[in-house]
């Protein structure tokens, strides 16, 4: 019954459960297990037997909170980009399609930001829970997402300028010469 509850809580917390709650490693010669013998093989603890003690690794809660805080920051950025795209779609200039096009370009970018932040959050939470050594900074993800956002904003700006220029150029040429 307890294992079912632990698995349920672990699935809610976005991590997988481990059958070993203690520090995992080899039984012999692992630094995660403390040996009671002192230098020269003497027993320094005063106990009768030379037993090994399995010491659990402590996980600092600040690590989990920092991971969650990073996830929430990325989600807030993606929600702001999504709101900008929806604003452009709903309240943009109706005479040209440039605002609609800019909104349609930014909407997938915001969804991409959300998906990326969710996968990074789950991966980090799982690695933290499993006590795997890892780098906590993401070197490739933000760079790729910023490049995608920059390209999409550039495309939206180019199409907006092109539509505006095409509209003013075509209206001035279609009116014909004006002689007053």
UniProtKB/Swiss-Prot annotation:
Keyword Transmembrane helix (UniProt): yes
Keyword terms, alphabetized: Membrane, Transmembrane, Transmembrane helix
Membrane topology: Multi-pass membrane protein
Membrane side Vacuolar: residue ranges: 92-100, 162-180
Listed GO biological process terms: post-transcriptional regulation of gene expression
Pfam families noted in UniProt: DUF202
GO CC annotation: acidocalcisome; acidocalcisome membrane
InterPro entries: DUF202, VTC_Complex_Subunit
Subcellular location: Acidocalcisome membrane
Disruption phenotype: Causes an abnormal morphology of acidocalcisomes, a significant decrease in the amount of polyP and a deficient response to hyposmotic stress.
Disulfide bond annotation, renumbered to this chain: none
Cytoplasmic side: 1-70, 122-140
Residue intervals passing through the bilayer: 71-91, 101-121, 141-161
Job description of the protein: Accessory subunit of the vacuolar transporter chaperone (VTC) complex. The VTC complex acts as a vacuolar polyphosphate polymerase that catalyzes the synthesis of inorganic polyphosphate (polyP) via transfer of phosphate from ATP to a growing polyP chain, releasing ADP. VTC exposes its catalytic domain vtc4 to the cytosol, where the growing polyP chain winds through a tunnel-shaped pocket, integrating cytoplasmic polymer synthesis with polyP membrane translocation.
Complex formation: The VTC core complex is an integral membrane heterooligomer composed of at least the catalytic subunit vtc4 and the accessory subunits vtc1 and vtc2. vtc1 is a small membrane protein without hydrophilic domain. Vtc2 and vtc4 are related and have 2 hydrophilic domains that face the cytosol, an N-terminal SPX domain and the central core domain. The central core in vtc4 is the catalytic domain.
Family classification: Belongs to the VTC1 family.
Protein name (database record): Vacuolar transporter chaperone complex subunit 1
Protein's organism: Trypanosoma brucei brucei (strain 927/4 GUTat10.1)
Lineage: Eukaryota, Discoba, Euglenozoa, Kinetoplastea, Metakinetoplastina
């Amino acid at each position: 019954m307890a294992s079912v509850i632990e698995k349920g809580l672990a699935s809610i917390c976005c991590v997988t459960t481990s059958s070993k709650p203690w520090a995992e490693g080899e039984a012999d010669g692992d630094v995660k297990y403390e040996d009671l013998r002192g230098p020269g093989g003497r027993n320094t603890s005063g106990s009768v037997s030379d037993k090994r003690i399995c010491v659990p690794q402590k996980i600092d809660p600040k690590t989990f909170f920092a991971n969650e805080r990073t996830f929430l920051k990325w989600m807030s950025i993606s929600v702001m980009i999504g709101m900008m795209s929806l604003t452009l779609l709903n309240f943009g200039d109706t005479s040209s399609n440039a605002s609609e096009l800019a909104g349609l370009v930014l909407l997938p970018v915001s969804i991409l930001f959300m998906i990326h932040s969710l996968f990074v959050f789950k991966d980090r939470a799982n690695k933290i829970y499993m006590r795997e050594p890892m780098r906590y900074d993401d070197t490739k993800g933000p760079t790729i997402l910023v490049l995608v956002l920059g390209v999409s904003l550039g495309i939206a700006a180019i199409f907006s300028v092109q539509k505006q220029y095409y509209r003013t150029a075509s209206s001035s040429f279609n009116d014909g010469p004006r002689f007053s």
